[in-house]
Amino acid sequence: MTTQIFQLPLKYCASSFSSTGQRNYGASSSPSPIVICKSNGISDGLWVKRRKNNRRFGSLIVKQEKGDVTEIRVPVPLTLEQQEKEKQNRDDEEDEIDEGDVDPEDLKYVNEIKRVIELLRRNRDMIFSEVKLTIMIEDPRELERRRLLGIEDADTPSRDDLAEALEQVNDGKIPKDRATLRMLHEEMIRWPNLEVEVSKKQRGKSMYAKSTDTGIDPKEAAKRLNVEWDSAAAIEEVDVDDEQGVVTKVAGYGALYFVSALPVIIGISVVLILFYNSLQ
């Protein structure tokens, strides 16, 4: 173990044991050379260990070279990296303990919740954020029923607790609160029409695209908008009769031209009215 010698410029209080076994207290006004030993080593055959409940501070052993040996423990703040490392180690230890005590019933709940999330994604095209937002919304009918029945339980998990547990399940973790996990499981399996697959409507042109020749190829636009090729191929031309198509185009362009020319018509009308009044 390496040691370093420093000079203390300020007064410091030292406690030491004399040869008679009595402890002496005194203040030294002159700087004395001291040896500082880090707490992670061995000093004079004694192991120096930091207390487990004090994670934010280490300790130094300060020994005076001259005279009787003095031992002072000086708290030293840990760096941010050391604090983060200790926190990570503590979390890893807790995870190992939790993984060793997994309840089969909790594991069953987690698997069923994952299955419901997968069904919602496949049948309803719902992403995880939408499922989480739905869980966070409180049903007003349930609130009214509890109010009428006088059910007020402070220990009942809140909607935020359910959303947090759902996020843990989605991350592959098992929530520690069994009551919250059980309530979340009941909410998920009671999702209405879970097994029914909703028919997806085929994409078509908008009303503006139907009435106006935009000159845009849907497949080319889909490429630029990063839309899947299958979805772009599903956008097909609508079968419209030629006569109906001509009438629709004329009506579409006529309305557009009329709206554009309306300010000009108003301006000309105002000028003519003023000119007519000036002649009188």
UniProtKB/Swiss-Prot annotation:
Family: Belongs to the Y3IP1/CEST family.
Record keywords, A-Z: Chaperone, Chloroplast, Membrane, Plastid, Stress response, Thylakoid, Transit peptide, Transmembrane, Transmembrane helix
The UniProt record lists the keyword Transmembrane: yes
InterPro entries: CEST/Y3IP1
Listed transmembrane segments: 255-275
Naturally occurring in which organism (per UniProt): Arabidopsis thaliana
Phylogenetic classification of the source organism: Eukaryota, Viridiplantae, Streptophyta, Embryophyta, Tracheophyta
Biological process, per Gene Ontology: chloroplast organization; heat acclimation; hyperosmotic salinity response; photosystem I assembly; response to photooxidative stress; response to water deprivation
Reported tissue expression: Expressed in cotyledons, rosette and cauline leaves, stems and sepals.
Record's protein name: Ycf3-interacting protein 1, chloroplastic
Membrane topology: Single-pass membrane protein
GO CC, alphabetical: chloroplast; chloroplast thylakoid membrane; thylakoid
Stretch forming the transit peptide: 1-62
Biased segments, Acidic residues type: 91-103
Region Disordered: start-end pairs: 75-103
